[in-house]
């Protein structure tokens, strides 16, 4: 992509990146409104271009009206986007499009205009559409390194997942969100850049500049034809002894290709692109496949993969169908595809990437494949004939695979697969037209093959090989013990064997292995003709030359050792190692004192030993599975220096023994049980307390599993605790112990608290166990006491509720009849003293009824069973009703009641009945304990913090702090009569029951309000009730 500015630099600008990630159409214009400085794929499509390169640095011919509208905005000195409605298009069709125009600063500080609009297709594929070509590759990568969308040839780069993760971390740390460096792609490193577009969720734009790896190029693309290719070809044809065939080839070269399909067996491998939808239906197949297998055989668009597999007879195990359902990256799947008009089928290797929209909606798979016509084999079902309706008349059927396979000479030299041997090299393959080779009896096939490379071509191959080794050596990072070239060769063989072994598993970035070529050391030869099975490369070709000792084995059976291992161990051959005992004789895991070694030791043939570092890989080996063990001798510099301990004399030894005995005595004196455990979970020893706690003798418990000390229900918890400490997780730091149930030797159970710690040198553990029987007993007693208190409270509440109902019935009768007799409705009483008695009976009855009601209310409040109806309550009206009820009593006591209500006081959320009761109780107490001639003031206010406050202030006798505490307790009264004058003293019926303030406070708290009282002797009392803002219905 050309342009004065790198594409990714502008894409990473703050004003551009988020819209780019959403798939908006974006266009950056110079202030002349004609020069396009930058555009993304949707933006190019909006103005009628398919590629970004077609528009960048070009001239955009905008309509005059559109140019005028955008120019009007560009004159404004603001960075805020402005909406502009313009008509794009021409002729008979012109659509109204809403554009957002904003002023931006380019990376070099130059001012420009950003024109953007949302597009209906906001998928990830749409965001990078119009980008990427043969040398430029684009991808969107999420926060974990998963490719969300990519250009057509991006998958061919073979970028590993670890490389993508490193790029994401670097982009996150960069101040400008952009990282530009060379990026590893397979065996190459090419220029690239990554930019973070969004943070939540994280999305990155990755741009790679460079050609696809060589192993993805066909032989025709990778190798230039020698200058004398035609002359050499003419040398081949006479030697075949087939003049008609020669004439037919010349005619084929002179005439155009016929319209009917003809299979070209000698064609190089071809790559093709395919797409399937979320339901597995093919939506696109590139014509490269039809060019090899025929148009009828490649006609799959609109068909489901399962239907095609059933017709063509591949994927019989359903492995590819299962991968299409898993929605994950996969590769390396090989199947046999029927060839139209023949009795053959060709191998096809497939790989695919899942495709998601911007909303993470699964859209299907995008994949590529490689078809290898040179490896065609016979199709027993002859599906290709059915596809073409029979063998064409003008075409001879090719040789059967069995006959062709006999053409391969046994002495042909095998080389590495193209994946290893031809990396970064041009393949020595000469494409030629199809021709039939008729075998000649008594003559080897290798004699028929004449080199097509002259001396110049051979020199070029040698130069390419030298260049390949040099680049590989330079690209490899240093590791200890090997040269760069040796390290590269070892990695190549390990990677190749691993890919062969995992051919049927999914790999995120693995690419299909290209075809095998055969190259002789002196005279390179072209690939061998078709065979029934591809010749496998000799796995030992590279292993034999490695300086690293390598062993291929399965269990105790050794399949192969290289010369480096024989040299280091001193054995003559593999048979000598097998005769000596195989794998067991090579490695010694125990030292002379019988202890297990921490490192691996290689034993030589003469009995000497050498420490080594080992690396184990699972590989495919000659049709099966095996393990490849590579060894690296450990030098003296790598070994830890042995600790030089001074020789201890007898006195120091005795002192140490005495110190150990003292420590053992201290442990035996401790009341807690101490148990030492080895790394396998067995008991090493225990102190006297542990022995007495469980009833085991020391020697009786040693060597047994630690779990034997616990009941069955606690064994799992104890062992999980032990295993959790063996690692370096959170449990090893936050070690808070466990409560477990111990099991005595005689079967009894003990509640224990156990703490386990790690021992530093022996890798064992130390468990400290404490008997918590007394704690459990105390805990049980407290629990029982709490339950008993709760039961007593419930009984009291039930008793008060029952007695109140039993008393009310006769009490109401007494009060009612006394009022009836005092009114003399059925006749005069005739004596004033009887009338006084009736009034006393009525007053006493009401007093007892109030007492019963208070008892019932406070018991309900304590039990949480008070029936309250929360609603909007006008506090001023409730207090006014209470004042009206108390005014007659205040008049009798000659006490003045004043009120100060705030206007427009908002309502509160409360129970109306209880609020009135609270106001009556507070006014009653204030009037009762205020001397005649003094006053009681009731006020309300609306505070700035949203609280609604009610205050009741009196100028009565007041109380001290201790008296306030006494008055707030139920059934407690202060001795207020001592401070009253004798003439103003009242009888007990006017002194209350001691429930007024406690009941008032309980009702206030039941209404979610706050109760406060402040009183001073001789000055009066102030009671304040505060309703918080959550209980206020403010406008």
From Swiss-Prot:
Region of interest (Interaction with DivK), residue spans: 614-1035
Gene Ontology terms, MF aspect: ATP binding; histidine phosphotransfer kinase activity; phosphorelay sensor kinase activity
Location of the protein in the cell: Cytoplasm
Swiss-Prot/TrEMBL catalytic activity: ATP + protein L-histidine = ADP + protein N-phospho-L-histidine
Chief localisation class: cytoplasm
Keyword Nucleus found: no
Pfam families noted in UniProt: HATPase_c, HisKA, PAS, PAS_8
Enzyme Commission no: 2.7.13.3
Domain Histidine kinase stretches: 802-1031
Subunit structure comment from the entry: Interacts with DivK.
Name listed for the protein in its UniProt record: Cell-division control histidine kinase PdhS
Native organism: Brucella ovis (strain ATCC 25840 / 63/290 / NCTC 10512)
Gene of this entry: pdhS
